[in-house]
Regions:
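Residues at secondary-structure transition points
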Residues: 8-10, 43, 100
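Residue-level detector of transmembrane insertion/anchoring sites
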Residues: 2-3, 28, 39
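A beta-strand edge to alpha-helix "cap/lid" segment located at domain peripheries
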Residues: 14, 24, 29-35, 51-53, ...
Length: 138
């Protein structure tokens, strides 16, 4: 079942987005729009000065970069959950899988909001592989 115009779908439910009113959490709305490739909704929810900081080779992506990646299948999330959210920040965790064959990662994301929109996302990630060992493990 698809969602009507001006709605986003997450976990089999449609959530209507009204101008300047969040009907679901900001993080959930952005994640749902990203997964579905809803560029119009992302355009509304992401601040023009947005930065995505991944710490991979000093890479920083902007709003247009994130919107162009949305819905492409380049990154898919599993077990996504929101750990904390208020009007200023949101913290989320999930398992990221990459279409290019890179090792999947457990990703913790810190999000900051400004003027009601997402302005910053910064991630920390742990590779998930069969041979990965914590320090001190034999």
């Amino acid at each position: 079942m698809g969602c009507r115009s001006r709605s986003v779908q997450s976990t089999r439910k449609c959530h209507t987005l009204l101008p300047h009113l969040w009907v679901m959490s900001k993080v959930a709305a952005i994640q749902a729009a990203f997964e579905s490739g809803d560029a119009e909704t992302l355009e509304e929810l992401i601040h023009d000065d947005y930065q995505f900081i991944s710490h991979v080779g000093g890479m920083v992506l902007g709003k247009s970069d994130m919107i162009s990646i949305a819905g492409s299948g380049g990154v898919t999330m599993e077990n996504h959950r929101i750990l904390f959210e208020n009007d200023e920040i949101g913290i989320e965790h999930g398992i990221a899988h990459f279409a290019n064959g890179s090792t999947s990662e457990a990703v913790l994301t810190f999000n900051r909001f400004k003027d009601g929109k997402l302005i910053l996302s910064e991630t920390g990630a742990t590779p998930i592989s069969d041979d990965y060992q914590l320090i001190g493990q034999d």
